[in-house]
C-alpha cells in the first residue's frame, strides 16, 4: 500500500468529520436548547451532553468560525484545503484524482457534489445565517467555565 494514498484516504475521512461537525452541531444546539428549557433536569447521558453542547461557548465559537471560513472561501471561489491536499497526495502517488479505493470513492462521491458555484454560495450562506440565528434563539452560556 502506498502511504500517500493512505494519507489521501485519511484526508477524505477527516473532511467527512468536519462536514459532520458543521452540519450536525446546529441540531445538537437546538436539541440542547429544547432540553435546557424543560423544568426537569436532563436525565440521560445524551440529553446532558446536548445541553452542554448548547451551552458551550468554545464549541459554538469553533463551529461558527469553521462555518465562516467555509462560507468566505466559497464566496471567493476557492477549494477547501483538505480537497487540495487530498488531490495533491493522489497526484504525487501517481493515482488519477478520480481513481480511489472503495471506501474513499464512496465517501468522496457523497462529499463532492456536482453543482454550480452559486448553489454552494447560496446554500452555505443560508446555513450560516441559520447558525447565527441559533446564537440568538439558543445562546451559549458565555459565563460557563470549561470542564476539567
Question: What is each residue range found by the language model?
Answer:
Residues 135-148:
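Membrane-interface capping segments at transmembrane-helix boundaries
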Residues 62-87:
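Hydrophobic alpha-helical membrane-insertion segments
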Residues 11-14, 62-65, 123:
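Physicochemical signature of membrane-embedded alpha-helices that form the seven-helix bundle of GPCRs
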Residues 7-8, 106-138:
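Individual transmembrane alpha-helix segments
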Residues 12, 19-29, 66-74, 128-135:
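Helical transmembrane-bundle signal
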Residues 2-58:
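Alpha-helical transmembrane segments and their immediate interhelical/interface regions
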Residues 78-116:
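Extracytosolic (periplasmic/ER-lumenal) interhelical loops and adjacent juxtamembrane/interface segments
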